[in-house]
């Protein structure tokens, strides 16, 4: 059979058209050394900083160092599977993480993979873990409150939507407890239909013990708070690269809510361990060490993360992302490198002191040096009305109390001030995992500031407060409802509250 030259040409053209040359092109390098979770790769001349590469075993790596003849990558996963001489290929993509409402109620790792045994997460939306923080024009000032349910914080150190408020203190002073209480306190808003009141929560555990995180997850499940919470986990046993990535991944999950007109709260527990993980990576990558052996860009490490928390303008949907970073200090030293860095980045700090904790003042908030740089802009009017003088009264009490230690002969006015201060301290005490609705907080603080507790023995103040709130919930719910809806104490509400308190205190004192 003789083929026509035209037919031969057609057959060849068809065959050539079917060959996809581009799909065959891959940029491949080789591992020249590997150890301690770091791989040095030769042959990836065009690779970008922050790009994901794939090793022969399927393990992913993140490019962090670009040198003249090689690149340095941190291995995200089991680095024992990576061997010298293995091929490494470029993905031409930066690190992305799964985002969306499908993640709510789930526990995921630093790369967004589920680790709770509840099956796959169904979401089609991905985001880069490193995103640029919103600019000045895209933001608006913080003006709406985030109710933590903790009297000492909501009254004296208010947190607003879009704020960055640092929780700082020694180990075992109740830092995580404040964060968990804040998550639990959002349950009431989620039980209502108004979307603008709901705050979705993300808890990021960096370098924590698995047992500790399991307890927190169980507590959130028992309180019914996991329905609106995402837990991101990079425990102490995981690679430093995953501990380094975890907060950025979680922040991208929070930005999904922020950029879609919703409100989110993210807790970084804790950034001290995050800085240690980054120091470990930097030293292994042979980057020059600075103060306390941290690399030179450790400030930028946290500033680029915390700047992503923002209250967006109306044009951008009016959503918000609030950040509560946690820092652990050593023996109360807040002048160390990482604490001072994060204090300068955030919009205020809540100082927790072990001395107060051991005295039984819990939450152990030092009201004198704790501050919210947003201030009363993040409080409802009713709270401003009752709590305006509390900080000053507590400061005067501390001064008088320290002065009274030098002598017992005090004039009646000073004695009265000290007694009043002691009762204020008592009324601000609160049990763990018992967040208090804002309207009940307002009643409690009103009772304290208006000196209704003067006739109640100090050891009975807590008992009195519980009895009073139980009574007002049962028989005078209209007062609480009025405060909640009006968001301020009108003359009418105040008259009703005064009448109730006078009758209740009279009856209570008879029982004593």
From Swiss-Prot:
Source species, domain of life: Bacteria
Family annotation (InterPro entries): ATP_synth_asu-like_sf (IPR023366), ATP_synth_asu_C (IPR000793), ATP_synth_asu_C_sf (IPR038376), ATP_synth_F1_a_nt-bd_dom (IPR033732), ATP_synth_F1_asu (IPR005294), ATPase_a/bsu_AS (IPR020003), ATPase_F1/V1/A1_a/bsu_N (IPR004100), ATPase_F1/V1/A1_a/bsu_N_sf (IPR036121)
Listed Pfam families: ATP-synt_ab, ATP-synt_ab_C, ATP-synt_ab_N
Localisation per UniProt entry: Cell inner membrane
Site feature Required for activity, where: 370
Record keyword Transmembrane present: no
Enzyme Commission code: 7.1.2.2
Topology term for the membrane: Peripheral membrane protein
Principal subcellular localisation of the protein: membrane
Record GO terms (molecular function): ADP binding; ATP binding; proton-transporting ATP synthase activity, rotational mechanism
GO cellular component: plasma membrane; proton-transporting ATP synthase complex
Residue sites binding ATP per the record: 169-176
Keyword set, alphabetical order: ATP synthesis, ATP-binding, Cell inner membrane, Cell membrane, CF(1), Hydrogen ion transport, Ion transport, Membrane, Nucleotide-binding, Translocase, Transport
Catalytic reactions of this protein: ATP + H2O + 4 H(+)(in) = ADP + phosphate + 5 H(+)(out)
Disulfide bonds: none
PANTHER family with a match to the protein in the record: ATP SYNTHASE SUBUNIT ALPHA, MITOCHONDRIAL
Subunit structure: F-type ATPases have 2 components, CF(1) - the catalytic core - and CF(0) - the membrane proton channel. CF(1) has five subunits: alpha(3), beta(3), gamma(1), delta(1), epsilon(1). CF(0) has three main subunits: a(1), b(2) and c(9-12). The alpha and beta chains form an alternating ring which encloses part of the gamma chain. CF(1) is attached to CF(0) by a central stalk formed by the gamma and epsilon chains, while a peripheral stalk is formed by the delta and b chains.
Protein's job: Produces ATP from ADP in the presence of a proton gradient across the membrane. The alpha chain is a regulatory subunit.
Family membership noted in the UniProt record: Belongs to the ATPase alpha/beta chains family.
Record's protein name: ATP synthase subunit alpha
Organism: Rickettsia prowazekii (strain Madrid E)
Gene that produces this protein: atpA
């Amino acid at each position: 059979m003789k083929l026509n030259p035209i037919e031969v040409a057609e057959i060849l053209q068809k065959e050539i058209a079917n060959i996809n040359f581009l799909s065959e092109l891959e940029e491949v390098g080789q591992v020249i050394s590997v150890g301690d979770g770091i791989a040095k790769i030769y042959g990836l001349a065009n690779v970008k900083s922050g790009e994901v590469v794939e090793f022969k075993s399927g393990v992913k790596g993140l490019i962090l160092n670009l040198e003249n003849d090689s690149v340095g990558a941190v291995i995200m996963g089991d680095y024992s599977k990576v061997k010298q001489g293995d091929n490494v290929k470029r993905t031409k993509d930066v690190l992305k993480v799964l985002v969306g409402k499908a993640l709510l109620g789930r526990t995921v790792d630093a790369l967004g993979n589920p680790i709770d045994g509840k099956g796959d997460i169904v979401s089609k939306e991905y985001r880069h873990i490193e995103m640029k923080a919103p600019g000045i024009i895209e933001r608006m000032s913080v003006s709406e409150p985030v109710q933590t349910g903790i009297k000492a914080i909501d009254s004296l150190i208010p947190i607003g939507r879009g704020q960055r408020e640092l929780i700082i203190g020694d180990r075992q002073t109740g830092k995580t407890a404040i964060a968990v209480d804040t998550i639990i306190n959002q349950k009431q808003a989620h039980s209502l239909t108004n979307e603008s009141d709901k705050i979705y929560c993300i808890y990021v555990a960096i370098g924590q013990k698995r047992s500790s995180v399991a307890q927190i997850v169980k507590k959130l499940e028992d309180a019914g708070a996991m329905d609106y919470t995402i837990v991101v986990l990079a425990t102490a046993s995981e690679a430093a690269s995953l501990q380094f990535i975890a907060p950025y991944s979680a922040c991208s999950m929070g930005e999904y809510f922020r950029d879609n007109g919703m409100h989110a709260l993210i807790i970084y527990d804790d950034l001290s361990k995050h800085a240690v993980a980054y120091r470990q990576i930097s030293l292994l990558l042979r980057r020059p060490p600075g103060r306390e052996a941290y690399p030179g860009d450790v400030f930028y490490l946290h500033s680029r993360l915390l700047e992503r928390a923002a209250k967006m303008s109306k044009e951008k949907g009016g959503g918000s992302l609030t950040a509560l970073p946690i820092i652990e200090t050593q023996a109360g030293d807040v002048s160390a490198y990482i604490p001072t860095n994060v204090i300068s980045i955030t919009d205020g700090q809540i100082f927790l002191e072990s001395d107060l904790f051991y005295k039984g003042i819990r939450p152990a908030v030092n009201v004198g040096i704790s501050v919210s740089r947003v201030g009363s802009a993040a409080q409802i009017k009713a709270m401003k009305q009752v709590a305006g003088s509390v900080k000053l009264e507590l400061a005067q009490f501390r001064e008088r109390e320290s002065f009274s230690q030098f002598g017992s002969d005090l004039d009646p006015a000073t004695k009265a001030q000290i007694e009043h201060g002691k009762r204020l301290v008592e009324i601000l005490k609160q049990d763990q995992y018992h967040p208090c609705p804002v309207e009940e907080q307002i009643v409690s603080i009103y009772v304290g500031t208006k000196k209704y507790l003067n006739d109640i023995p100090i050891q009975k103040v807590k008992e009195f407060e519980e009895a009073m709130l139980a009574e007002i919930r049962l028989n005078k719910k209209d007062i609480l409802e009025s405060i909640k809806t009006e968001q301020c104490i009108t003359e009418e509400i105040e008259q009703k509250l005064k009448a109730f308190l006078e009758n209740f205190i009279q009856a209570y004192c008879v029982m004593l």
